[in-house]
């Protein structure tokens, strides 16, 4: 009887270790960091807004969908953001650093993705009064992994992009020249593969079946010893 209990306990411990190992491996494969740049819309030219985005970003896969978590500085200047039509989901703020981290659903982690940014400034900049109110399209260039697939599609982005080189109230140009072009949500090779790997569900089911079988075996042996 003692030997049977030892085998039973060892088996349970082994199952726990196996499940934990596979779960950790799956989670590790579906999250990480990615470098990126912010371009002027539909170009390869770096946007002036690029300086307001901290690098790298973080990506995570949840329920078969891909998300990126992006941190911006000068947070109070950036009044709104969206990527592929998906509005930001603010997950953290740091008032002291004037930063916030927002999460966006995306279709891929590598390549160009369209976005939109709203900027409002009404304060002194470099010692001079400055007022700037602008909404414009931008393009993100993600340099993340190509082997992490998502099942999501782009949302409906706002088609009304703002004009290019604007001026503040003091007549100083912002140095930003964004394209005045409608956003057609051109997504390169959208990923449509399923989400969570099948083995994540198979392992617990198989483990439960094995546990039941071992339990029944132990009970049967115990009855045999008593009789």
Swiss-Prot record:
Matching PANTHER family: IRON-REGULATED SURFACE DETERMINANT PROTEIN C
Propeptide: 193-227
Topology versus the membrane: Peptidoglycan-anchor
Span of the signal peptide: 1-28
Residues annotated to bind heme: 47-48, 132, 136
Induction info: Repressed by fur in the presence of iron.
Cellular localization per UniProt: Secreted, Cell wall
NCBIfam families named in the record: IsdC, srtB_sig_NPQTN
PROSITE patterns: NEAT (PS50978)
Molecular function, one GO term: hemoglobin binding
One GO BP: heme transport
Name the UniProt record assigns to this protein: Iron-regulated surface determinant protein C
Gene Ontology cellular-component annotations: extracellular region; peptidoglycan-based cell wall
Gene: isdC
Low complexity biased stretches: 161-175
Entry keyword Chloroplast: no
Short motif NPQTN sorting signal, span: 189-193
Region (Disordered): 149-194
